[in-house]
Swiss-Prot record:
Locations listed in the record: Secreted
Lipid-modified sites (O-octanoyl serine): 29
Organism: Oncorhynchus mykiss
Lipid-conjugated positions (O-decanoyl serine): 29
Tissue: Highest levels in the stomach. Moderate levels in the brain, hypothalamus and intestinal tracts.
Protein name in UniProt: Ghrelin
Post-translational modification: O-octanoylated by GOAT/MBOAT4. O-octanoylation or O-decanoylation is essential for activity. The O-decanoylated forms differ in the length of the carbon backbone of the carboxylic acid forming an ester bond with Ser-29. The majority of trout ghrelin is Ghrelin-20 modified with unsaturated decanoic acid. Ghrelin-20 and Ghrelin-23 are amidated. In some cases, Gly-50 is retained after dibasic amino acid cleavage, to produce non-amidated Ghrelin-21 and Ghrelin-24.
Length: 111
């Protein structure tokens, strides 16, 4: 009798283990069977944005001043907006240009 009982328990444990393994493997992915996981094509680094030379950087400051909103926008590798009056721009424009050239200019020529 104990042999039949042990065999029954062993079969019950195997069935339970098989059902548990199926439920664990079914919950391991959120994709449906018809969907395949996406594979990354390009594993390289994204391209870097290069520095601009001083001549092209100086061209950013040339151009008409917006009279209606008094908002100056400078576009470099990023965009920065400064709001000031025309008198303030006349007074501080050269200083701002020098600071931005020192910050964003080529490090070899800045030193």
């Amino acid at each position: 009798m104990p042999l039949k009982r042990n065999t029954g328990l062993m079969i019950l444990m195997l069935c339970t283990l098989a059902l548990w393994a199926k439920s664990v493997s079914a919950g391991s992915s959120f994709l449906s069977p018809s969907q395949k996981p996406q594979v990354r094509q390009g594993k390289g680094k994204p391209p870097r944005v290069g520095r601009r030379d001083i001549e092209s950087f100086a061209e950013l400051f040339e151009g008409p001043l917006h009279q209606e909103d008094k908002h100056n926008t400078i576009k470099a590798p990023f965009e920065m907006g400064i709001t000031m009056s025309e008198e303030e721009f006349q007074e501080y424009g050269a200083v701002l240009q020098k600071i931005l050239q020192d910050v964003l200019g080529d490090t070899a020529t800045a030193e």
